[in-house]
Amino acid sequence: MSYIEKIDPDMFEAIQKEADRQEHKLNLIASENYASRAVMEAQGSIMTNKYAEGYSGKRYYGGCDFVDIAENLAIARAKEIFGAKYVNVQPHSGSGANMAVYFSVLQPGDTIMSMDLSHGGHLSHGSPVSFSGKLYNIVPYGVSKETEALDYDELMKMAKECKPKMIVCGASAYPRVIDFKKFREIADEVGAYLLADIAHIAGLVVSGVHPSPVPYADFVTTTTHKTLRGPRGGMIISKTEELAMGVNKAVFPGIQGGPLMHVIAAKAVAFKEAMDEKFRQDQAQTVKNAKVLCACLKEKGFDIVSGGTDNHLMLVNLNNMNITGKDAEAAMSKAGIIANKNTVPFETRSPFITSGVRLGTPACTTRGMKEKEMELIADYIETAIKNAGNDALLSEVSAKVRDLCSRFPVYS
């Protein structure tokens, strides 16, 4: 940091303040986590200096001997932790990974059946404001109004009616186990490709805490941060060599030029960390923590979408609390708790306002927090949301949150 402090004091100050925020605020954003010092060291390494268009052994630049080693390590480790045969670690993001999969087997105008964003899907699965919604004919599916969970019989019926070229499963705000085998059966019934986007649950999957889509899906995409605790980036797993060849061409030269070799090096480090028993224990604890936090909030009268959680996140419908997601997010922020407003199934408000909040336990679990801390956190959330206009009380909660965080440092 001394180099930045000397060259760019303004940026140094911003980084220091962000470091303080991360250490002393309670992060409940389900898509965020803390990369290890080893991952950050790799990402900040001299690998950033190297251009390496192409793939290992077939580059368009000389001098790629050692970045080839880095990419080969990332690929081999990804294959091992996911039990996969064909892996591309070059995508810069999860959305880019999805784009490459679409481009590899679909034509503009083809039909994609995917989860509606307001029911827990993702922008890149076909939202009208995303490239995916503009290029393809999107048939959205949602959760059952009765159970607020997926109804696979209804999905089969929809697929038979719309006959999609591709079915996308996976979500950014769905708290229940996804049955990838049933999705495979639905895809086979209508002759569709199956893409499983496991960006949120990848860490749970490699640890055996959530079923894996790899045996069932034609394509599996993921980010490498979130529950995987790696650098920000994407990855694609393909079921067959033929599909993998199409994906490789779609990634480069299709949508990207040079890969980010420093990020790929960091991905390799993260995948090695994911092989460790401590990582697996943390993933199991992440789910335990989510279940406890969820149960505590239910006891306090909060309406939990689908009645609970099977993974790392939960959706809280705040309509019975007479507060919007936007206002709840702001109140929690004043109390030192960082979360995000979120639409709930059958939402009636704007996505800028929302009726709910999404809460996740990956980041606080990485800090070492367990069930006992989840009970405290539920108390803090209740106080913040039920006293949104009481700045003095929110300040008191913030002090308690800061004390809690100080007992579980991110980078000790």
Curated annotation (Swiss-Prot):
<protein>
    <recommendedName>
        <fullName>Serine hydroxymethyltransferase</fullName>
        <ecNumber>2.1.2.1</ecNumber>
    </recommendedName>
</protein>
<dbReference type="Pfam" id="PF00464">
    <property type="entry name" value="SHMT"/>
</dbReference>
<feature type="site" description="Plays an important role in substrate specificity">
    <location>
        <position position="225"/>
    </location>
</feature>
<dbReference type="InterPro" id="IPR019798">
    <property type="entry name" value="Ser_HO-MeTrfase_PLP_BS"/>
</dbReference>
<keyword id="KW-0554">One-carbon metabolism</keyword>
<feature type="modified residue" description="N6-(pyridoxal phosphate)lysine">
    <location>
        <position position="226"/>
    </location>
</feature>
<dbReference type="InterPro" id="IPR015421">
    <property type="entry name" value="PyrdxlP-dep_Trfase_major"/>
</dbReference>
<keyword id="KW-0808">Transferase</keyword>
<dbReference type="InterPro" id="IPR015424">
    <property type="entry name" value="PyrdxlP-dep_Trfase"/>
</dbReference>
<dbReference type="GO" id="GO:0019264">
    <property type="term" value="P:glycine biosynthetic process from serine"/>
</dbReference>
<dbReference type="InterPro" id="IPR001085">
    <property type="entry name" value="Ser_HO-MeTrfase"/>
</dbReference>
<dbReference type="InterPro" id="IPR039429">
    <property type="entry name" value="SHMT-like_dom"/>
</dbReference>
<dbReference type="GO" id="GO:0030170">
    <property type="term" value="F:pyridoxal phosphate binding"/>
</dbReference>
<keyword id="KW-0028">Amino-acid biosynthesis</keyword>
<comment type="function">
    <text>Catalyzes the reversible interconversion of serine and glycine with tetrahydrofolate (THF) serving as the one-carbon carrier. Also exhibits THF-independent aldolase activity toward beta-hydroxyamino acids, producing glycine and aldehydes, via a retro-aldol mechanism.</text>
</comment>
<comment type="similarity">
    <text>Belongs to the SHMT family.</text>
</comment>
<comment type="pathway">
    <text>Amino-acid biosynthesis; glycine biosynthesis; glycine from L-serine: step 1/1.</text>
</comment>
<keyword id="KW-0663">Pyridoxal phosphate</keyword>
<feature type="binding site">
    <location>
        <position position="117"/>
    </location>
    <ligand>
        <name>(6S)-5,6,7,8-tetrahydrofolate</name>
    </ligand>
</feature>
<feature type="binding site">
    <location>
        <begin position="121"/>
        <end position="123"/>
    </location>
    <ligand>
        <name>(6S)-5,6,7,8-tetrahydrofolate</name>
    </ligand>
</feature>
<feature type="binding site">
    <location>
        <begin position="350"/>
        <end position="352"/>
    </location>
    <ligand>
        <name>(6S)-5,6,7,8-tetrahydrofolate</name>
    </ligand>
</feature>
<dbReference type="InterPro" id="IPR015422">
    <property type="entry name" value="PyrdxlP-dep_Trfase_small"/>
</dbReference>
<comment type="subunit">
    <text>Homodimer.</text>
</comment>
<feature type="binding site">
    <location>
        <position position="242"/>
    </location>
    <ligand>
        <name>(6S)-5,6,7,8-tetrahydrofolate</name>
    </ligand>
</feature>
<dbReference type="GO" id="GO:0005737">
    <property type="term" value="C:cytoplasm"/>
</dbReference>
<dbReference type="InterPro" id="IPR049943">
    <property type="entry name" value="Ser_HO-MeTrfase-like"/>
</dbReference>
<comment type="pathway">
    <text>One-carbon metabolism; tetrahydrofolate interconversion.</text>
</comment>
<keyword id="KW-0963">Cytoplasm</keyword>
<dbReference type="GO" id="GO:0046653">
    <property type="term" value="P:tetrahydrofolate metabolic process"/>
</dbReference>
<dbReference type="GO" id="GO:0035999">
    <property type="term" value="P:tetrahydrofolate interconversion"/>
</dbReference>
<dbReference type="GO" id="GO:0004372">
    <property type="term" value="F:glycine hydroxymethyltransferase activity"/>
</dbReference>
